[in-house]
Amino acid sequence: MSGRFSRSIYVGNLPGDIREHEIEDIFYKYGRIVDIELKVPPRPPCYCFVEFEHSRDAEDAIKGRDGYNLDGCRLRVELAHGGRGQSSSDRRGGYGGGGSGYGGGGGGGGSARFGVSRHSEFRVIVRGLPSSASWQDLKDHMRKAGDVCFAEVTRDSDGTYGVVDYTNYDDMKYAIRKLDDTEFRNPWARGFIRVKKYESSRSRSRSPSRSRSRSRSRSRSRGRGRSHSRSRSLSRSKSPRKDLSKSPRRSLSRSISKSRSPSPDKKKSPPRAMSRSKSRSRSRSRSPSKSPPKVREGSV
């Protein structure tokens, strides 16, 4: 490797309160330092890139400071793979955009030859990695099964794990068969790892989300249908109650009106009958009073 890549080193597992002048104090004796780029991710540990004037100085710094104990943190010093002289996106591709090789935010490694990482669809996930594992350690171990084009180490609630991309399908299948349940080791730790085919979260979440959405829509439609039927049944059941409640009132009002209407007729009818009977009796009483004079005239 030539150019700026060979003059730049990657320093990982730095303390969270590290300053640039402290980094300069650690590496100044190996040669003239051109630039120091310190990275402080949201989660520790920190890491940095140090660029020397000569590539020989960078090699001496790696030999002298790799494994150096700084305030209880064991430094990891290695040659920067695409970490310097590239854009920020290339740096993220070379080192995962943050964190050292110790899982403090993850690390990704691309091709050491070109300093550029590339992904593929032939991906495996590696569980059971020690917390001190770096992407370079993972790549070196998984390279036993085939050509690795990308490696990344990160951490979740289950611990430290890695993602490895192979250039072809056969190497991926061979890695699952050969490297599953094998011992992984680096200078600081060792452990048995599990290697499985990587399944993206999208493919996992698609089918449940569809089934859930369908079941929810069905349950909602059923619930709505039931609510409509209940509302209809309630409206139907309420209607007779209203009729029943209204009908007695109407019948009562009608009965009351009927009972009220004849009462004045009855009260008024007796006077009419009395007046008629009185008039008839008067007429009858008048008629006999006129008859005696006629008899008298006949007798004369």
Curated annotation (Swiss-Prot):
Q: Where is the composition biased (Basic residues)?
A: 203-239, 275-287
Residue span of region Disordered: 81-110, 198-300
Example GO biological process term?
RNA splicing
Q: Which CDD domains match?
A: RRM2_SF2_plant_like
Q: Name one GO cellular component term.
A: nuclear speck
Q: Name one GO molecular function term.
A: mRNA binding
List the Gene3D superfamilies: 3.30.70.330
Q: Give one Pfam family.
A: RRM_1
Ordered alphabetically, the record's keywords are: mRNA processing, mRNA splicing, Nucleus, Phosphoprotein, Repeat, RNA-binding, Spliceosome
Subcellular localization is given as: Nucleus speckle; Nucleus, Nucleoplasm
Ranges for domain RRM come to: 7-82, 122-200
Output the SUPFAM superfamilies linked to this UniProt entry. Answer: RNA-binding domain, RBD
Q: Where is the composition biased (Low complexity)?
A: 253-262
Other known facts: The splicing pattern of the pre-mRNA is regulated in a tissue-specific manner and by development, and changes in response to various types of abiotic stresses and hormones.
Protein family per UniProt: Belongs to the splicing factor SR family. SR subfamily.
| Subunit field text | Component of the spliceosome.
Record's protein name: Serine/arginine-rich splicing factor SR34A
Q: Which organism is it from?
A: Arabidopsis thaliana
What gene is behind this protein?
A: SR34A
